[in-house]
Amino acid sequence: MIQEQTMLNVADNSGARRVMCIKVLGGSHRRYADVGDIIKITIKEAIPRGKVKKGDVLKAVVVRTKKGVRRPDGSVIRFDSNACVLLNNNSEQVIGTRIFGPVTRELRNEKFMKIISLAPEVL
């Protein structure tokens, strides 16, 4: 459950370490984002010589949440931290070339197959 002002870890090698959600996209008064949703973020902490820098405003897709994802069989997949993967603002393509940590099967639609293929583990 990601909302405005939520701090997230970054699960790719784009150069950002911590980001903050500034808007949940998809509806005029949408409050929460879940796994697979696109959010608008600003970078709060970045490494030197990365592809992005502190203060950049980008889009990101949520790949892990502490709240978890409920499956149709009743099971719930939860993670220890909230994490996202950064996307290009215009084309919504993945900025990084590697994904760190597991991602959920809920990302498996045409838009995020790139994230699924780069991820080391799909739960």
Curated annotation (Swiss-Prot):
InterPro entries linked: Ribosomal_uL14, Ribosomal_uL14_bac-type, Ribosomal_uL14_CS, Ribosomal_uL14_sf
Record keyword Ribosomal protein present: yes
Keywords: Ribonucleoprotein, Ribosomal protein, RNA-binding, rRNA-binding
GO cellular component: cytosolic large ribosomal subunit
Pfam families referenced in this protein's UniProt entry, alphabetically: Ribosomal_L14
SMART domains (UniProt xref): Ribosomal_L14 (SM01374)
An example Gene Ontology biological process: translation
Single annotated GO MF: large ribosomal subunit rRNA binding
Keyword Disulfide bond: no
SUPFAM superfamilies: Ribosomal protein L14
Family per similarity comment: Belongs to the universal ribosomal protein uL14 family.
Record note on quaternary structure: Part of the 50S ribosomal subunit. Forms a cluster with proteins L3 and L19. In the 70S ribosome, L14 and L19 interact and together make contacts with the 16S rRNA in bridges B5 and B8.
Function description: Binds to 23S rRNA. Forms part of two intersubunit bridges in the 70S ribosome.
The protein's name in its UniProt record: Large ribosomal subunit protein uL14
